[in-house]
């Protein structure tokens, strides 16, 4: 994927020193953002009871933002404001904009979140909706965009899709009385490899252009951390008359996206990883403007719009409370909403987005490129491919990855390495049978933490 300043950084001879890592932190223009988050302490992550933040002054090293981001300090403030609104004015909170609240009234709150998210995914605000959860949103989008016929029914997807995506796709195929064994086409890497080349994806598109109805891929592959060339793949697939959707769970808040300009048909994402909106937080979806049009040329009572599963909250606010059972959708992605969204969930999402509103994904990406490159440099320094008991299965090309590096350990090493990292107060994700996923997040992680992680990781492997 073409990105600005995406060449791999080079490092000087003293780059492996603790002092050099500290110098990078001192020069980091985004360093102050770390103060806007609550970093779990080493004492707390070992505690067996509920604990207050900062039980001890020593923070853990949290490299698990690709699984769950940490809590912004704004979250408690936003939640308290919402609880005060509910307790003080009850149902009036739906329509009352309180002057000292950081959030709009409840009926406008989803739009507030969607506007901020649109900047993160490169879309017009009307093309984004804050709603539901990732898999539920994928179901809703596939209900609208997956229209199989007898001859054009296949879905092209990732060979190692996150299981929830696999289940969702499989169930939609079965819903149409089709056989998943015939209608699911898994695109995988060459034997012994983990990276899927863009050329291979394009070749699958060519091979199935006549019988595929949908291409649905992850923007970033959750296991390997590979960032796919979204614009190139999208353009090519659409030239072959495929509908194109993307699961951006690991791309949202991680890499630059331009969904509108790339002409993506639809996309969905969760907000609790790099988005920091909390466990199981409200998700988001994108529907390109051309699919969200509402045509009233045949009269106000006969709107024409793309078929979707509907609910009252997708209806235009001007008629939402008329209760006349005449559905008039909100133009754009908002028309795909189903139910009244949780104001509590939206509070957590808006709190997380308030941090992103202070910067840009391009600035975060610039730091992320250097942070992850530094991690890679330290991991590989003074080793050879034969001497290393691990392999980085994430692409070495910075244009083909986000913040995450996936480290595939030799058989039998995962448990011992995981225990060593945990004892050192380092939180990162492990995936059986042998992968450690490490994700330094530019909003709150430091170069010094990268340095310390590598010391502990190498010690665990006796390097």
Swiss-Prot record:
GO terms for molecular function: kynureninase activity; pyridoxal phosphate binding. GO terms for cellular component: cytoplasm. It comes from the Eukaryota. Pyridoxal 5'-phosphate binds at residues 134-135, 162-165, 247, 250, 272, 312, 340. Its EC number is 3.7.1.3. Its cofactor is pyridoxal 5'-phosphate. The keyword Thylakoid does not apply. Keywords: Cytoplasm, Hydrolase, Pyridine nucleotide biosynthesis, Pyridoxal phosphate. It catalyses: L-kynurenine + H2O = anthranilate + L-alanine + H(+); 3-hydroxy-L-kynurenine + H2O = 3-hydroxyanthranilate + L-alanine + H(+). The modification N6-(pyridoxal phosphate)lysine is found at residue 273. This is Kynureninase 2. The gene is bna5-2.
